[in-house]
Amino acid sequence: MARSIWKGPFVDGYLLKKADASRATGRSEVIKIWSRRSTILPQFVGLTFGVYNGHKHVPVNVTEEMIGHKFGEFSPTRTFHGHSADKKARRG
């Protein structure tokens, strides 16, 4: 079930402060965040966030198309190594 419109998008408070501070300094450095549940807002466009995936911070450059999505969608937590080959098919 989607979030109610009257509640508005969820964003951790510290995330807004970090984004505003980064815009004020004008430096393009990676902002490390652990809040995968936060929604990407229009004021984050152009910034680079390091979204934690449980192992490392994955750099995510925010673009217009990402607005409304969650940060966690762009930082996968699992690595797929492929399925094992069918042993019957290999025998010939």
Curated annotation (Swiss-Prot):
PROSITE patterns: RIBOSOMAL_S19 (PS00323). GO terms for biological process: ribosomal small subunit assembly; translation. Keywords: Ribonucleoprotein, Ribosomal protein, RNA-binding, rRNA-binding. Gene3D superfamilies: 30s Ribosomal Protein S19, Chain A. The keyword RNA-binding applies. GO terms for molecular function: rRNA binding; structural constituent of ribosome. GO terms for cellular component: cytoplasm; small ribosomal subunit. Belongs to the universal ribosomal protein uS19 family. Protein S19 forms a complex with S13 that binds strongly to the 16S ribosomal RNA. This is Small ribosomal subunit protein uS19. It comes from Methylocella silvestris (strain DSM 15510 / CIP 108128 / LMG 27833 / NCIMB 13906 / BL2). The gene is rpsS.
